[in-house]
């Protein structure tokens, strides 16, 4: 157990006990990945369900050694590094510079050399595509509650990724973005389900796999 005091902002956390705390880590044993994080970082608080969620996402997306995968809203690498264990190359995009730094350190910690991370605001329609002209075989989206509508709008009508794995903490915005994917971007819903990430509450984690129809 570690105890911290937060006077005001998240970056003002002060350790109370012990005075020199060891780094906090969580593990994804199916992917042989260990991720370091700070007390104020966003992580999934249900460690067991997070492990199952990552495993299931990889089963559905099915990355292959010769494929490139784009991980949007990648955070500190929760999906990126497990994806990199199986794909040829993974690019993670995140708007938080501190999380990008931690994702890079986590890649080094796990000796992952085929994952790259870039800083970009995925919610700004004026921001150029942070992946530039690069094309990716598969995408994984794990956005905040507001969803990924601006990202979905960036998808070309033809020639987009073959599969898109969408992980959502808000079924409402997932439904909205799914409508765009299916009715305007040429995808079909191939699989869907929920995980009870917060038992005895109304909140669930939803997952949906989309495949390019054409």
Which ranges hold each PLM region?
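Rossmann-like S-adenosyl-L-methionine
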Residues: 1-214
């Amino acid at each position: 157990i570690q105890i911290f005091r937060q006077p005001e902002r998240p970056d003002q956390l002060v350790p109370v006990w012990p005075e020199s705390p060891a780094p906090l880590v969580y593990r994804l044993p199916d992917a042989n990945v260990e991720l370091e994080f700070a007390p104020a970082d966003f992580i999934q608080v249900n460690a067991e369900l997070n492990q199952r969620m990552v495993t299931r996402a990889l089963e559905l997306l099915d990355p292959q050694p010769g494929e490139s995968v784009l991980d949007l809203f990648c955070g500190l690498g929760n999906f990126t590094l497990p994806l990199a264990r199986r794909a040829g190359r993974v690019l993670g995009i995140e708007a938080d510079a501190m999380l990008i730094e931690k994702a890079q350190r986590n890649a080094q910690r796990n000796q992952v050399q085929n994952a790259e991370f870039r800083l970009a605001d995925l919610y700004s329609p004026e921001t150029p595509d942070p992946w530039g002209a690069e094309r990716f075989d598969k995408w994984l989206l794990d956005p905040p509650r507001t969803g990924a509508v601006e990202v979905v709008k960036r998808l070309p009508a033809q020639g987009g990724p073959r599969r898109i794995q969408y992980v959502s903490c808000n079924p409402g915005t997932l439904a909205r973005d799914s409508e765009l994917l299916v009715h305007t971007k040429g995808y079909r819903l191939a699989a869907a389900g929920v995980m009870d990430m917060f038992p005895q509450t109304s909140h669930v984690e939803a997952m949906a796999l989309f495949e390019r129809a054409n």
